[in-house]
Swiss-Prot record:
This is Small ribosomal subunit protein bS21. Belongs to the bacterial ribosomal protein bS21 family. One of its GO terms (molecular function) is structural constituent of ribosome. InterPro entries: Ribosomal_bS21, Ribosomal_bS21_CS, Ribosomal_bS21_sf. It comes from Endomicrobium trichonymphae. One of its GO terms (cellular component) is ribosome. Keywords: Ribonucleoprotein, Ribosomal protein. One of its GO terms (biological process) is translation.
Amino acid sequence: MVSVKVREGESIEEAIRRFKRECERNGVMQEIKKREFYKTPSILKKEKLAETKRKIRRKMFKDSKWSK
């Protein structure tokens, strides 16, 4: 859980900005977006497989293009 204490002499706007930065660093917003809709285990498996294929394809392209 992200928490920010307002420092002495700090405005609320500055504290909110610090809070937003901390949320970004900790991946809170990404987690919220990821959990916004339920995904069945089969869909998660397909997405993971597709991501793995993309990574392999990128690596092969990079290796073949730059190895010459």
